[in-house]
A protein has these predicted regions:
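Periplasmic-binding protein-like
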Residues: 153-154, 182-192, 214-217, 223-224, 256-282, 295-318
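A bilobed periplasmic-binding-protein/Venus flytrap-type ligand-binding module shared by bacterial periplasmic
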Residues: 159-164, 202, 272-284, 303-304
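Short, polar/charged alpha-helical segment
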Residues: 37-48, 52-76, 158
Length: 356
């Protein structure tokens, strides 16, 4: 990458001049997308000769490992080396490796869709369109040049502790969180620490206005860092309601009989997207293509849903019973380019409002 490893993520993204337009993470079309490719015996044999695929991901480790083991079971002779860390670290690691001409990773996943815009602009991703992506993915969830597609989708939601809040008294909207009865009872994550919450904060200030956050700040909220923290505080009963946080954590807790319940705000819930892509100079190109086809195919997507509590845009993936289908939920519109363009000002304004 033509970047300096010491630069911050946002400085690198701003310097890239990345541009998005309209769709979840559509980028300016620079070339025609390649034709869709099915999984063939020739590809499988070539992948087996390579013997390995290296996967950098920000997906929760148990979910990433389940995906890897399922792939290995389907394609014996090919191992998956999972390197899991946060999205920020994934981005920094790729930048450091490529600036040193080290090509160690095959397939990458990040919970920050804007990373893929940078990698694409730097010319280090390779086009590859799995057959199932071409057939079953909406246009807005695949790069028009075929360089990445939505591997996982989730929401940042409101939720409450069912031991502390009766269903009929629970908030139904973001506006409800401003009711004085919730003062001192709300937990919230920080956009300065969490990419998920930065994305959610951008969407919420765009749709609800900064006045919402100014009023929320008067509610004496518990401020935490990661998007995984509000569900934990909720589960422990340290707060009755969370204003934001990962939907998938709430699913996992609820299905483990923990006292939590999701709420889908009437104004819409922020939508978060985490794509997958393949690097052009990867060491195992055939194994990378086979793994990408598996991860983005129905089998990999169903595993994400069942094990990870995640959503999928694959048209044939089945929602898990007991969860509200994504198609029935009003969501806010994702715009990674705007998040990166306005990220520093969003963070600064948030800090001023909440004094944290």
């Amino acid at each position: 990458m033509r970047k300096h490893p010491g630069l911050s993520r946002r400085a690198m993204l701003k310097g890239s001049g990345a541009v998005l337009a309209g769709a979840a993470f559509s980028t300016r079309v620079m070339a025609a997308a390649p034709p869709a490719e099915p999984v063939t015996p020739t590809l499988i044999e070539a992948a087996r000769k390579e013997g390995q695929v290296v996967y950098y991901t920000s997906t929760d480790l148990p979910v990433a490992e389940k995906l890897a083991r399922a792939f290995e079971a389907k394609y014996p002779g090919i191992t998956v080396r999972v390197e899991r860390t946060g999205a920020e670290r994934v981005f920094q690691r790729v930048g450091q490796e490529y600036s040193s001409n080290i090509h160690a990773v095959d397939v990458v996943n990040s919970s920050d869709a804007a990373h893929f815009i940078v990698w694409k602009r730097d010319g280090i991703l390779t086009p590859y369109v799995p057959e199932e992506v071409a057939r079953y993915y909406p246009d807005e969830h695949r790069d028009p040049d075929g360089q990445f597609a939505s591997f996982r989708v989730w929401l940042s939601i409101i939720a409450y502790n069912t031991n502390l809040v009766k269903a009929e008294e629970a908030p139904k909207s973001f506006a409800d969180l401003l009711d004085p009865k919730w003062k001192g009872k709300i937990v919230k994550a920080h956009p300065g620490y969490s990419g998920t919450i930065m994305t959610a904060t951008y969407q919420m200030q765009r749709d609800l206005g900064w006045s919402f956050f100014e009023q929320l700040a008067k509610q004496n909220i518990m401020q935490v860092q990661s998007s995984t923290d509000p569900p934990k505080k909720l589960d422990l009963g340290e707060r009755a309601v969370m204003a934001d946080g990962n939907e998938y954590n709430i699913f996992q807790m609820k299905e483990a009989s923990r006292p939590v319940e999701p709420v889908y705000a009437t104004e819409g819930s922020p939508l978060i997207v985490g794509p997958n892509g393949i690097f052009k100079d990867c060491p195992h190109p055939n194994a990378a293509r086979l793994f990408q086809s598996f991860a983005l195919g129905r089998e990999g997507q169903q595993l994400n849903i069942e094990i990870g509590g995640l959503r999928s845009v694959h048209a044939q993936a089945q929602e898990k019973a007991g969860r509200k289908p994504l198609k029935d939920i009003k969501t806010m519109k994702d715009d990674p380019a705007a998040v990166e363009r306005e990220g520093e000002s969003i963070k600064s304004r948030y800090i001023r409002i909440f004094r944290v």
